[in-house]
Regions:
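Short, surface-exposed terminal/edge motifs of secreted or surface/virion proteins that either
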Residues: 26-48, 144-153, 208-218, 265-272, ...
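Trp- and S/T/G-rich repeat-edge/linker motifs of beta-rich repeat architectures
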Residues: 1-8, 37-57, 172-178, 214, ...
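Small/polar beta-strand repeat architecture
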Residues: 1-13, 26-27, 91-244
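Beta-sheet-dominated scaffold domains
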Residues: 10-15, 250, 256, 264, ...
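N-terminal assembly/attachment segments of tailed bacteriophage virion structural proteins
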Residues: 1-23, 82-85, 111, 115-125, ...
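Short, intrinsically disordered, charge-balanced linker/junction segments flanking boundaries
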Residues: 87-90, 165-168, 406-411
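Pro/Thr/Ser/Gly-rich low-complexity, intrinsically disordered linker/stalk tracts
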Residues: 48-70, 79-93, 171-195
Length: 411
């Protein structure tokens, strides 16, 4: 299996595993998954940070009674197995005729009909395939050109992308009707999405899309339903889209995949949606299963080094040890709490979990354990290398392992 990692980068790799999929992270490379599909079949691929549930296509709206009101709708698909909500369904499509290799990237699509701030989807591009299947926001619109930004508003730099050759389509991630009647009804239709159990429909009001209904069919009639703006469609995000934003460490906890420590945000924690490891979408207002972003900020720089899943989630940083919790033991966007437990600080050597404690290397080549103490209701530990300092003085531990049987031994 070919990899992008050099020999010098091997000891900077972090890895964590779920079943036959191992996640690999390095601060100079996009996160990847090493997957085993058979004993002699392995693949290493970049992680696509999008919902796995396919989105509806060919979303269209037709008025049952004509009028002079505008109405704009978003349709998403809901997965039948895990209730994951898809990206916004796409409606109008416009052919691409050119794409620049520049910063920012500019797409030419004659008469595209896109407005500033619209979410768009690009597909079927020849040559510059780096854009295919991704979501962008549009800015600096002219009649025939679109300047691309990511969904956070950062310009897309296509300077090092493959040269565009031909083809491609721009698809708008909503559909609008310009002659609907505010007191009558409009019918929204779309093509079915593979794996979907149902579809959620949102309508725009004052610039915000709110929930108006759900159906298992591929058609829905809006008979002047007032949108619920407390339930909005998810906004797709890829926090690791650009150089200097690749994570250095990660793990799993409470059915979320965790990442931390990018070159640009050393103290930041990134949690996927619950049970949807590739999905970092959020809603406004937030929902309990939304993706989470949090920053550890206290006393000094706390570069995130390791995630340790015990009965609680522990985060080891360069400056201390932290407990991550939520209300009623559930970590959500609105309840996440990050509490310091001690201030020893961990090196980059991957910690060992032995039974119900963590063993980690702290600064000065001291080995410490860390476990829950009932009497203080906190995590604490001891320097377990104190009786064998001669093994560590003037030496650097570069790797280690643990054997639980026949004797508990740290090698």
């Amino acid at each position: 299996v070919a990899t992008p990692y050099t020999t010098a980068e091997v000891f900077e790799l972090d890895y964590f595993q779920s079943a036959d999929v191992m996640t690999l992270v390095h601060p100079s490379h996009e996160p990847r998954e090493l997957t085993r599909t058979a004993n002699d079949a392995w693949t290493l691929e970049k992680i696509v940070f999008q919902p796995k549930q396919a989105f509806p296509t060919n979303v269209s709206v037709s008025p049952n009674t004509t009028g002079s009101e505008n109405a704009s709708y978003v349709v998403t698909a809901v997965n039948r197995d895990n209730a994951e909500e898809s990206l916004r369904g796409t409606g109008s499509s416009f052919a691409i005729s050119a794409i620049t290799k520049a910063n920012p990237c500019v797409v030419t699509a004659t008469g595209h009909g896109v407005s500033n701030g619209d979410e768009i989807h690009i597909s079927d591009v020849g040559g510059m395939t780096e854009l295919n299947g991704d979501r962008f926001k549009a800015r600096a619109i002219t009649t025939n050109t679109i300047t691309l930004t990511d969904t956070a508003g950062n310009d897309i730099n296509s300077t090092n992308f493959t040269t565009y050759t031909s083809g491609g389509n721009v698809l708008i991630a909503y559909d609008e009707i310009a002659n609907g009647n505010a007191t009558a009804d409009n019918t929204i239709t779309w093509n079915a999405a593979s794996g979907a159990e149902s579809y959620t429909i949102y309508k725009e009001k004052n610039g915000i899309y709110g929930f108006i209904g759900r159906t298992e069919e591929t058609t829905f009639t809006d008979d002047n339903i007032d949108p619920d703006l407390s339930d909005t469609p998810p906004k797709t995000r890829n926090p690791f889209k650009s150089t200097n934003n690749f994570p250095s460490t990660g793990g799993f906890f409470q059915q979320r995949r965790l990442f931390g420590n990018t070159n640009e945000n050393r103290q930041r924690l990134f949690f996927s949606q619950t049970a949807n490891f590739t999905n970092h979408a959020v809603s406004s207002p937030t929902k309990d299963d939304d993706a989470i972003t949090a920053t550890i900020a206290a006393l000094q720089v706390n570069e995130v080094r390791h995630f340790v899943p015990l009965s609680d989630l522990l985060v080891l940083t360069s400056g201390g040890e932290w407990q991550v919790t939520g209300v009623d033991d559930r970590i959500t966007p609105s309840t996440i709490q990050v509490k310091p437990q001690s201030y020893y600080g961990a090196t980059t050597l991957k910690p060992i979990v032995a039974g119900d404690i963590a063993i980690f290397m702290c600064h000065g080549q001291h080995v410490r354990d860390l476990g829950y103490k009932f009497e203080t209701d906190a995590y604490a530990g001891n320097d377990i290398s104190i009786l064998a300092r001669h093994l560590f003085d003037f030496n650097t531990v570069v790797d280690w392992d643990f054997a639980s049987a026949p004797f508990s031994s740290l090698w």
